[in-house]
UniProtKB/Swiss-Prot annotation:
It is found in: Cytoplasm. It comes from Pseudomonas syringae pv. tomato (strain ATCC BAA-871 / DC3000). CDD domains: SmpB. This is SsrA-binding protein. Gene3D superfamilies: 2.40.280.10. The gene is smpB. InterPro entries: SmpB (IPR023620), SsrA-bd_prot (IPR000037), SsrA-bd_prot_CS (IPR020081). It comes from the Bacteria. Residues 131-160 are annotated as: Disordered.
Amino acid sequence: MAKLKKHPTGTIAQNKKARHDYFIEHKFEAGLVLSGWEVKSLRATKVQLVDSYVLLKDGEAWLMGCHITPLKTASTHVIADPTRTRKLLLNQRELEKLTSSVQQKGYACVALSIYWKQHLIKCEIALGKGKKEYDKRHTERERDSDRELQRAVRTKGKDD
């Protein structure tokens, strides 16, 4: 059997849309409660975090909207629900901080990435404030100007 290529940082999936839609203020590392077929699918990077968010309810954190596609070779006697809610494991102090911040207007808790940390699967969640449309355009303009500046620096070095 051929070895699977491992991503150098251990990152399984990223939610780039969350970084585009929110000003990220605080990041937290949370463990995930998963079943066996989900771990196999995550090894094969069959996960999407695009519309995922964190729901804080009854002193617990739940990952909603995360889609983990079951593998064809997964167990047939277990009914796989790709979009089920998954429990996030956080310290009580972190949960209290998230709960108090989310109750403020404009703040949301979103999943940024899922990655390997040694043999465990972790989820990076973030507390963010929603961006307005003009903020998104401003960020895009800054990124474009930085890219142009880098190009100019590179071409100036080649002319010498």
